[in-house]
C-alpha cells in the first residue's frame, strides 16, 4: 500500500513538473542559429573596410566596393 501511494505521488509530481517546463527550453541550437541569421540580415549596408561582393548588401552611402570579383572591400569614393 505504501509503495502504491509513493508511486502515485511520484507520477503526479512528474506530470506537474513536465507541464511547467514545456516550451521553455526546446531547441536552443535552432534559436541561436535563427538569431545569428537575423543579425546578419538586419544590417542594410556594409561599413568601410568590410568585405563586399555582388551578392552581399551594398556598401553604405559615400562608399564603393573595390575588387568585387576577388572579394572586394568597401572604400571611400
From Swiss-Prot:
Family: Belongs to the conotoxin O1 superfamily.
Record keywords: Disulfide bond, Knottin, Neurotoxin, Secreted, Signal, Toxin
MF-aspect GO terms: ion channel inhibitor activity; toxin activity
Description of its domains: The presence of a 'disulfide through disulfide knot' structurally defines this protein as a knottin.
Residues that make up the propeptide removed upon maturation: 20-43
Signal peptide region: 1-19
Pfam families: Conotoxin
Upper lineage: Eukaryota, Metazoa, Spiralia, Lophotrochozoa, Mollusca
Record's protein name: Conotoxin CaHr91
Subcellular location: Secreted
Cystine residue pairs: 45-60, 52-65, 59-74
Tissues and organs where the protein is expressed, per its UniProt entry: Expressed by the venom duct.
One Gene Ontology CC term in the entry: extracellular region
Amino acid at each position: 500500500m505504501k509503495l502504491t501511494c509513493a508511486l502515485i505521488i511520484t507520477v503526479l509530481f512528474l506530470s506537474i513538473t513536465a507541464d511547467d517546463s514545456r516550451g521553455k527550453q526546446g531547441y536552443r541550437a535552432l534559436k541561436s542559429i535563427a538569431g545569428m541569421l537575423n543579425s546578419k540580415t538586419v544590417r542594410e549596408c556594409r561599413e568601410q573596410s568590410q568585405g563586399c561582393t555582388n551578392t552581399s548588401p551594398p556598401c553604405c552611402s559615400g562608399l564603393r566596393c573595390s575588387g568585387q570579383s576577388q572579394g572586394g572591400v568597401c572604400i571611400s569614393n
